[in-house]
């Protein structure tokens, strides 16, 4: 049960890796497929995990992870607890701009099982942006995929002059406005 570390491995040339953690099933898979369909000028590796830690026996085959997106389903308290438990297996250096919280199901606020304050507090405690979306709607799923790809591109160091930490600070400041 190893802790994920952001700089343990060398980056791969012309590629970036994102890890989607949480909210098992269709929406997470559909988001990954939407990301793969988008036009991009670099190779993308998408890994899906229901929770952390990742199995250590395949660690030597796993590429360097550039961005971790924790997926929280707003209608499932288990989803939030799963993400909170998984955070213990992430090295603190990932929280310097290489983590975001993706909250799904916001279109069904009347079926909400998770306190919004708990989600905002999670983002604040871990200095990471919180992104709200509805992955069941195609248009919003595509927009979310594009946004995550741009974040991944920045986190992988593929945008000159913009670091992951700087971008994360910009996102956090704009969320408070």
UniProtKB/Swiss-Prot annotation:
Keywords: Centromere, Chromosome, Nucleus. Component of the CENPA-HI complex, at least composed of CENPH, CENPI, CENPK, CENPL, CENPM, CENPO and CENPP. The gene is CENPM. It is found in: Nucleus; Chromosome, Centromere. Signal peptide: none annotated. InterPro entries: Centromere_Cenp-M (IPR020987), P-loop_NTPase (IPR027417). Pfam families: CENP-M (PF11111). One of its GO terms (cellular component) is chromosome, centromeric region. Component of the CENPA-HI complex, a centromeric complex involved in assembly of kinetochore proteins, mitotic progression and chromosome segregation. This is Centromere protein M. Its main location: nucleus. It comes from Gallus gallus.
């Amino acid at each position: 049960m190893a802790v994920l570390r952001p700089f343990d491995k060398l980056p791969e040339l012309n590629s970036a890796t994102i890890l989607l953690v949480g909210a098992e099933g269709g929406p997470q898979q559909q988001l990954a497929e939407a990301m793969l369909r988008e036009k991009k000028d670099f190779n993308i590796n998408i890994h899906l995990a229901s929770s952390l830690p990742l199995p250590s026996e395949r660690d030597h085959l796993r590429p360097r992870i550039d961005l971790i997106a924790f997926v929280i389903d707003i209608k499932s308290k288990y989803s939030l607890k799963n993400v909170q438990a998984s955070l213990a297996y992430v090295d603190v250096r990932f929280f310097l701009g290489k983590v975001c919280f993706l909250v799904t199901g916001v279109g069904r606020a009347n079926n909400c099982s998770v306190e919004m304050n708990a989600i905002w507090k999670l983002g604040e405690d871990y200095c990471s942006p919180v992104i709200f979306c509805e992955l069941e709607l195609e248009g919003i799923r595509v927009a979310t995929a594009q946004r995550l790809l741009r974040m991944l591109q920045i986190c992988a160091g593929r945008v000159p002059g913009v670091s992951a930490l700087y971008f994360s600070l910009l996102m956090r400041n704009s969320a408070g406005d």
